[in-house]
Amino acid sequence: MDLPEPLHDFLLVFLGSGLILGSLGVVLFTNPIFSAFSLGLVLVCISLFYILSNSHFVAASQLLIYVGAINVLIIFAVMFMNGSEYYQDFRLWTVGDGITLMVCTSIFVSLITTILDTSWHGIIWTTRPNQIIEQDLISTSQQIGIHLSTDFFLPFELISIILLVALIGAIVVARQ
């Protein structure tokens, strides 16, 4: 979007805080329905980030697929489950939680240091998207593919990692 810089910065901070609060709600709420609604807030904030970065197609896909389908499916699955059996053995803190916290914190710190130490300006893409998109012979689906592999490479990879984690989580839940 072509917004004035102070408004753009305000929206970035607002969406970032909504994203952080929603993700904390997903993890910290003991009621699974509240966690699912917090996940919906996180996914909506991510799609609004895509709108701010002028990738409206990815934002619409995010809203339709994740918020409209996946999150609603999660809410229905949680509503059909018997929740009383999960709260009988509830403990506030275990040794496994501490180990998980240490591992996740170390991964988070290593990712932050890697992101801050990387010179992102030195990355050279093999194709320049402006040169390719100016050609009239390329169809719309090819333009989307070029954008996904050049301009939106990092968000596309992050979405694939989120899908992988969701698949692994679904397998773990299905085995129990």
Curated annotation (Swiss-Prot):
Enzyme class, UniProt record, top EC level: translocase
UniProt GO cellular component terms: chloroplast thylakoid membrane
Record keywords: Chloroplast, Membrane, NAD, NADP, Plastid, Plastoquinone, Quinone, Thylakoid, Translocase, Transmembrane, Transmembrane helix, Transport
GO molecular function: NADH dehydrogenase (ubiquinone) activity; quinone binding
Subunit relationships: NDH is composed of at least 16 different subunits, 5 of which are encoded in the nucleus.
Biological role: NDH shuttles electrons from NAD(P)H:plastoquinone, via FMN and iron-sulfur (Fe-S) centers, to quinones in the photosynthetic chain and possibly in a chloroplast respiratory chain. The immediate electron acceptor for the enzyme in this species is believed to be plastoquinone. Couples the redox reaction to proton translocation, and thus conserves the redox energy in a proton gradient.
Catalysed reactions listed for this entry: a plastoquinone + NADH + (n+1) H(+)(in) = a plastoquinol + NAD(+) + n H(+)(out); a plastoquinone + NADPH + (n+1) H(+)(in) = a plastoquinol + NADP(+) + n H(+)(out)
Transmembrane segments: 10-30, 32-52, 63-83, 92-112, 152-172
Designated name of the protein: NAD(P)H-quinone oxidoreductase subunit 6, chloroplastic
Family statement drawn from the similarity comment of this UniProt entry: Belongs to the complex I subunit 6 family.
Membrane topology according to the record: Multi-pass membrane protein
